[in-house]
Amino acid sequence: MAITKYKAAAVTSEPGWFDLEGGVRKTIDFINEAGEAGCKFVAFPEVWIPGYPYWMWKVTYLQSLPMLKRYRENSMAVDSEEMRRIRRAARDNQIFVSLGFSEIDHATLYLSQVLIGPDGAVINHRRKIKPTHVEKLVYGDGSGDTFMSVSETEIGRVGQLNCWENMNPFLKSLNVSAGEQVHVAAWPVYPGKERQVHPDPATNYADPASDLVTPEYAIETGTWTLAPFQRLSVEGLKINTPEGVEPETDPSVYNGHARIYRPDGSLVVKPEKDFDGLLFVDIDLNECHLTKVLADFAGHYMRPDLIRLLVDTRRKKLITEADPNGSIATYSTRQRLGLDKPLSKKEGDETTDVL
């Protein structure tokens, strides 16, 4: 049965920098906290595990190499025991989880998100379609079968996007067309506009993301929009500074940017600069009607006979194989990574749950 009213939470906290195990433990702690608070849904920031590598915007190539090595070593495979522990935490708390993480698949990293159900199943697994600017130093592109965002669940049609994907008009159109009701606008960590230096545009600072892009997404799509953000501490600044470079000393410009918005774009909650934890919201899916009765860009307020979006969800592989019938064999990333398999009952248990 669909649940139309429930409590949800957005995480605004400091990740376990370069620390896969620490990040997993902190993730489970927040899932437990959200579950104890009565939440049906909790949303984490972009690449929460093992933290967003903001240092890549400030380092030279040679400075980046040891940091990249360490970052890759602490990124998480989606079919890993670390991910299964997180999935079990979701199941133990009977809660939906939107998790952003740096995914390692073979030798490439991706800015990935999963939507985990209250049974521990991975409902959706997606990868950011295009890393932003210097993010290409670290991450690869998502493929056709890993970029869809919206999933039908008992708490509504839930969508997820990473960072500047939230201002991509084509991705917004795609999500609107799926009837999205609850959206996770997952953001990383980056400074506020008080740190802006000419000619760097305001686009590249946290305030427009929090106070322009995110509420714009909410009002354009008519969705409850949760915007989890990472934070930084003095120690975090040191960890994210290459050896031999003097670290910044004031982390406050990086903090206080998480938000939650109603479907009409009005603000529900924003944290103080020093707040670290969960932001809560009481969601009523029926409130989406108040906005969508005025403007539903997937229905009465659109003209598909004039404007349409072409979407290609096929995976393009480097190596193709012939199947027994002589045509091209296909497989999905989801199947290859084992996400179609049920979750084991407990850590170390080889048996699986009944489907």
Swiss-Prot record:
Protein name as annotated: Cyanide hydratase
Top EC class, one word: lyase
UniProt KW keywords: Hydrolase, Lyase
Catalysis: reaction(s): formamide = hydrogen cyanide + H2O
Induction of expression: By cyanide.
GO molecular function: cyanide hydratase activity; nitrilase activity
Stated consequence of mutating C163A: Completely abolishes enzymatic activity
Activity-pH dependence: Optimum pH is 8.5.
Any one biological process term the GO annotation gives: cyanide catabolic process
Pfam family, one: CN_hydrolase
Active-site residues annotated for this sequence: E46, K128, C163
EC number(s) stated in the UniProt entry for this protein: 4.2.1.66
Function: Catalyzes the hydration of cyanide to formamide. Degradation of cyanide may be important for plant pathogenic fungi in infection of cyanogenic plants. Also has low but significant nitrilase activity with acetonitrile, propionitrile and benzonitrile.
Annotated signal sequence range: none
Domain CN hydrolase: 6-286
